Amino acid sequence: MKKILILCPYPESMAAGQRLKYEQYFESWEASGYELQKSSFFSISTWDVLWSKGHLLRKITGTIQGYFRRINDLYKLQGCDVVYIFMWATPLGLPFYEWLILKSGKKIIYDFDDAVFNLSDHISLIKGGYKSRFLIKHSHQIIS
């Protein structure tokens, strides 16, 4: 059975973009013989405060926890055949994490949202807007 590691920003069924782009296909993929491992960067508790005013400490803590979750995901690469990335694997900084996935030799499917290209220049530097260009250049398959 082929295994797909799905790296996404938000918990399953929480974000409309994820539901519309790929979550609706989970049952079909599993019926076709794929085993899915899903890993969101943000936890449900972080999602609950992410877009609200305040809660800065919870947002920072949730982001740090997300990076630890992604480090743990590197160990899951051995058991998967394909890595499916929706929007980004990590939200900030250089595409180092994405480079590690590339160096693992796993095929990457990159499903990007056009919103990743609508960042202002200073926000793009912080959020790693060039990650999308890196993933577009190095992925085996691109979905837009």
Question: What residues fall within each predicted segment?
Answer:
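N-terminal subdomain of nucleotide-sugar transferases
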Residues: 1-41
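Short catalytic/ligand-binding loop motif for oxyanion handling, primarily in non-cytosolic enzymes
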Residues: 14-15, 46-48, 91-94, 117-120
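Short connector loops at secondary-structure junctions
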Residues: 37-47, 113-117
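A short, charged, and often flexible helix/loop element on the N-terminal side
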Residues: 41-72
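Surface-exposed, active-site-proximal loop segments in enzymatic domains
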Residues: 51-54, 122-127
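Membrane-proximal helix-turn-helix segments that form the acceptor-binding/catalytic region
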Residues: 68-80, 92-110, 116-117, 124-143
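Short beta-strand scaffold positions
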Residues: 85, 143-144
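Short His-centered aromatic/hydrophobic patch
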Residues: 85-91
